[in-house]
């Protein structure tokens, strides 16, 4: 007899339907798995055999052949344990068949418990597309999978529980989609940050237009503190963004029963010792940091300390919003549209340009330190802002700045203007094409005159001109202005005149 169980698999961060076909035949007892299984799938034979026996059931004394179709796609992970076991029990007459529009996923323990798997939400979305209406998943994945529409998700704790449900004796209660809690949406507040009003304003502009930022300042000036509060002023994620980000985190095993859905915008701050593979994506086609930060913020502290090859792999995601990972296991394309926020000291010791003569670096040493900055990466940074050390009086003063919520309301209004402006493709001012800029970056006569003066006086390049115009458009959006006025140009130019950086590299000078 042949039993067919509908299941699901993962490739990259996308799911696809898999059919587990189980055939019991005569001959010497043997358990064969075919269909390009990896080592984890092959080990399912021992987990399934032990689970059947420890649940008080009989493992067939016959030849068991399991085919995971389509047979030309590699199968990985432990997600097929439960469908294989259920197919064997159905084929041997020890379990009732599943409905034709039902699918099963889950890892087994040796005692018959059903353990969580990675990628529950992407597989649930794939189940929807495949016309599946009932999905049996590990209880630890149920709330995550239930976020998919038009799908009844049954949380399964143990094999006997599933068998009793299929027999109609005691039904499993379907899982409910997770509701957001206040704790999930809490962020550190900018009201807690003393001083640095100019930097807060620069980060507000960056958040409103999706611009990449570089903060330069001495140790202890608050660069990391300011960066960590940036997600709190970004707009809430849409349902589509939530599904994308949750899917990526789920494939990496970063979701759990307590936090099944990612509702906060991601904030990733990888250490400067990470490898290029960890940044872009690993050997097993796992998403890297640029994808884990999708729809959120990627914070690189001590930017010059990162290996150059690590910084270079960010060029494609910053340009295209996706990253292509090619490894021996195959090729995968992951979404990776994020805000890049970088921080660095002005020199190796950190005290260049500070009063008191604390810096011991030579000018040659400072230039060499700045030359570590990747030219193509700096090309994609719109806002560069100095973060000065706080004076004693500022440290003693009680924080009296605006709250993140107040700033966020202005950011939301500016983002809504951009959403209405760009019908498709472009999602923020930072991603404007030359055609978009021609259409939407109109300057007042006074604004045009100031832009011309700044261009000649500062020796700006064409690239700097484009960056200034994009940032000025965002500043105008925050002000509710249709055209770009002189005050918008003046503020945008301020974010490009960074005399506190010295470098022999032409890419990091205006």
Where do the protein language model's features map onto the residues?
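Conserved, well-folded catalytic cores of nucleic-acid-processing
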Residues: 23, 39, 47, 51-58, ...
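Short secondary-structure boundary/capping segments
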Residues: 10, 94-96, 145, 182, ...
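Conserved ASCE/P-loop NTPase catalytic core
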Residues: 201-369
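Peripheral, non-AAA+ core regions of ATP-driven protein-machinery
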Residues: 1-214, 218-224, 464-465, 482-510
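Short coil/turn segments at secondary-structure boundaries
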Residues: 100-101, 176-179, 255-262, 423-432, ...
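Basic, amphipathic alpha-helical bundle interface domains used for macromolecular binding and assembly
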Residues: 34-45, 58-60, 67-77, 284-285, ...
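Positions in alpha-helical segments
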Residues: 185-188, 228, 364, 453
